[in-house]
């Protein structure tokens, strides 16, 4: 759990923390990225996926299903076809009279914030389909305010002119615009703007593709794959931005924030929903406090110039129903980012502006919320996230910070299905509220921080699925929810991390074992839990670097049953299935040394804790409890008062030992 506070700077404490910093184990190389070769001297966890043949078949119902968001339900009243050729074009209008549509060249203008390109304007109320093809240099600005519209990209390549504006812009509010990519087509949109380019910036809209209304990226149907759309941001703000919500369906969407001065790949004010398709996001932006994220939802939009704040009550969320998502970013991979601590909603100095989002009439119509609800819900898909940035934070929420987490929700985070692989420098999964895992297959590995971290009063609940969570060493752990409950009711669970851990709740419905490092073996060895007949009921092969503590649970472990722990066993995989070396179906196991025997749980206490857990000294050995130096209880400084007369850690250490001096 990360809490920012005003620290008392004390030179002696800085020295103590620095001397102890070597105990922290890093999972990354000096570039901040995960190493691709085997090199475990620094405790790096290497996992290239070769230890996985398990296929998760969990399914969950899709959320936020809106019939009008399906392109097959869009019926156009007219069509505007534009064929580009360099700086010129030809057009054809059908279904409506040609005079109803204005297509004209425009120049850079600071007075009305237009940039050099073509302006396509329709003032009527009919639903139009715009078909774009060919090559063009300049901004394509579509003014279609009164009805939904579709923009079909038919092998088109658009590049904004001289860094003066976005490449594709839509003015429509309170409507949806479909960006349709037919199967067999390849389309590229390139925004040439760079940061601090004000002398040539005539249109400073926030996205390379920018819309005031909802944007829906899709193939021609919701059941068949579409074509390919590449969006390249050279280094100015975001690649895709909507002041409403963004939805992604069947297409291949590749978004790259190419320049280090760029920001997020896809950002929306109200929501992001991913239903299907192949989504690849690369964010290289390294601006302090604005490093690139992959998918981000703000929840509110405060304008300090006219002192207004725009938001939609109950929005601010991210829902992933399916698709193949591959994200590599400096900062967060996926984040529902709205913070109540930073909001100006309700501030008398600001005028609240109702956001007439289509979500209000289609999805949020029964909400009783007064403010945004920044939750994340995952109902399926294949999600891979790698973050590369070095975490840092200031004294307060308003100070610069970078938390390169994999998936973040400022409210609750729920995983119902999906295969998720997260390799991050900060927490792999983080929620300001509760975390509930009902299904899916999740691999979460953090090189510097916790693997899965909840800050909600109900903590972390695992009801099913497969979870392999690997935190850093020392003060970091696999599962962190401080004094809130960590409850395991079902699923296959393996956690590795530091011994300053959150203890599983004894009231969980599934037998759980907590083992100290001397009981589960060393790196690259295999652990087996066997029953009284010597049959393996739990098998895990440790990665190339070990940790101080292991938490494990499985439906195969029963209460009132005696088990033994064997280390250094020989495993013959055969046809057994495994997920990042956690076996779901049991392999053949032989040999090894018995480290523990006669261990069991009861119906009233589902957790067995090894006597080797909870021994040690400064800064965190043992289950989470109020701080101190002592052996057997955790010296965890996060979110708790420090011992009397002891100064707080210096700013930047996040209440724990630093990984290294900066």
Q: What are the language-model segments listed below?
A:
Residues 2-12:
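Bacterial N-terminal signal peptides that target proteins for export
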Residues 9, 27-662:
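A composition-driven surface/loop motif
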Residues 12-21:
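Hydrophobic helical h-region of N-terminal Sec-dependent signal peptides
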Residues 22-26:
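C-terminal motif of bacterial Sec signal peptides marking the signal peptidase cleavage site
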């Amino acid at each position: 759990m990360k809490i920012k506070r005003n620290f008392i700077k004390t030179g002696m404490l800085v020295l103590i923390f620095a001397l102890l910093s070597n105990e922290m184990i890093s999972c990354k190389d000096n570039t901040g990225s995960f190493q691709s070769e085997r090199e475990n001297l620094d405790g790096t966890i290497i996992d290239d996926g070769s230890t996985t043949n398990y296929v998760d078949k969990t399914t969950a119902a899709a959320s936020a299903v809106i019939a009008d968001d399906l392109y097959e339900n869009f019926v156009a009243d007219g069509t505007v076809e534009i064929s580009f050729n360099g700086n010129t074009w030809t057009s054809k209008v059908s279904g409506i009279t040609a005079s109803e549509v204005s297509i004209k060249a425009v120049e850079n203008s600071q007075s009305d914030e237009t940039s050099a390109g073509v302006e396509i304007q329709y003032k009527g109320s009919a639903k139009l389909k715009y078909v774009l093809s060919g090559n063009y240099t300049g901004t394509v600005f579509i003014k279609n305010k009164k009805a939904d519209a579709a923009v079909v990209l038919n092998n088109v390549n658009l590049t904004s002119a001289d860094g003066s504006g976005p490449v594709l812009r839509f003015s429509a509010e309170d409507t949806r615009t479909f960006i349709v990519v037919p199967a067999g087509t390849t389309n590229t949109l390139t925004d040439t703007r760079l940061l601090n380019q004000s002398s040539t910036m005539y249109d400073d809209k926030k996205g390379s593709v920018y819309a005031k209304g909802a944007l829906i990226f899709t193939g021609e149907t919701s059941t068949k794959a579409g074509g390919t759309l590449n969006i390249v941001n050279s280094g100015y703000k975001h690649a895709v931005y909507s002041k409403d919500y963004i939805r992604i369906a069947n297409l291949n969407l590749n978004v790259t924030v190419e320049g280090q001065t760029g920001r997020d790949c896809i950002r929306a004010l109200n929501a992001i929903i991913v239903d299907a398709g192949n989504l690849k996001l690369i964010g290289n932006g390294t601006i302090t406090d604005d490093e690139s994220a992959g998918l981000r939802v703000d929840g509110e939009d405060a304008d300090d110039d006219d002192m207004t704040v725009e938001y939609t009550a109950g929005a601010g969320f991210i829902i992933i129903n399916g698709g193949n998502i591959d994200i590599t970013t400096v900062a967060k991979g996926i984040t529902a980012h709205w913070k109540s601590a930073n909001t100006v909603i309700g501030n008398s100095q600001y005028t609240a502006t109702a956001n007439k989002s289509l979500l209000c009439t289609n999805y949020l119509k029964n909400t009783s919320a007064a403010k945004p609800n920044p939750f994340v819900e995952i109902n399926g898909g294949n999600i891979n996230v790698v973050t590369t940035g070095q975490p840092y934070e200031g004294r307060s929420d308003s100070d610069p910070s970078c938390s390169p987490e994999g998936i973040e929700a400022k409210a609750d985070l729920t995983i119902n299905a999906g295969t998720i692989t997260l390799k991050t420098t900060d927490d792999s999964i983080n929620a300001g509220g509760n975390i509930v895992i009902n299904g899916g297959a999740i691999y979460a590995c953090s090189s510097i921080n916790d693997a899965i971290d909840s800050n909600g009063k109900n903590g972390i609940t695992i009801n099913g699925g497969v979870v392999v969570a690997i935190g850093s060493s020392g003060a970091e752990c696999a599962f962190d929810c401080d004094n809130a409950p960590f409850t395991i009711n079902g699923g296959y669970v393996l956690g590795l991390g530091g011994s300053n851990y959150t203890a599983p709740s004894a009231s969980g419905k599934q037998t759980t074992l907590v083992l100290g490092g001397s009981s589960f073996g060393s790196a690259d060895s295999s652990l087996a839990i066997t029953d009284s007949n010597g049959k393996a009921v739990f098998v895990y092969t440790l990665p190339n670097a070990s940790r101080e503590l292991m938490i494990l649970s499985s439906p195969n472990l029963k209460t009132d049953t005696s088990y033994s722990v064997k280390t250094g066993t020989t495993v013959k995989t055969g046809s057994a299935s495994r997920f990042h070396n956690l076996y779901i179906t049991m392999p053949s196991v032989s040999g090894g040394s018995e480290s523990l025997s006669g261990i069991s749980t009861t119906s009233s206490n589902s957790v067995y804790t090894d006597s080797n857990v909870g021994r040690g000294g400064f800064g965190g050995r043992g289950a989470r409890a109020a701080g101190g130096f002592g052996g057997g209880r955790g010296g965890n400084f996060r979110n708790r008062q420090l011992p009397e007369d002891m100064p707080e850690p210096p700013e930047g250490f996040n209440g724990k030992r630093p990984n290294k001096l900066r």
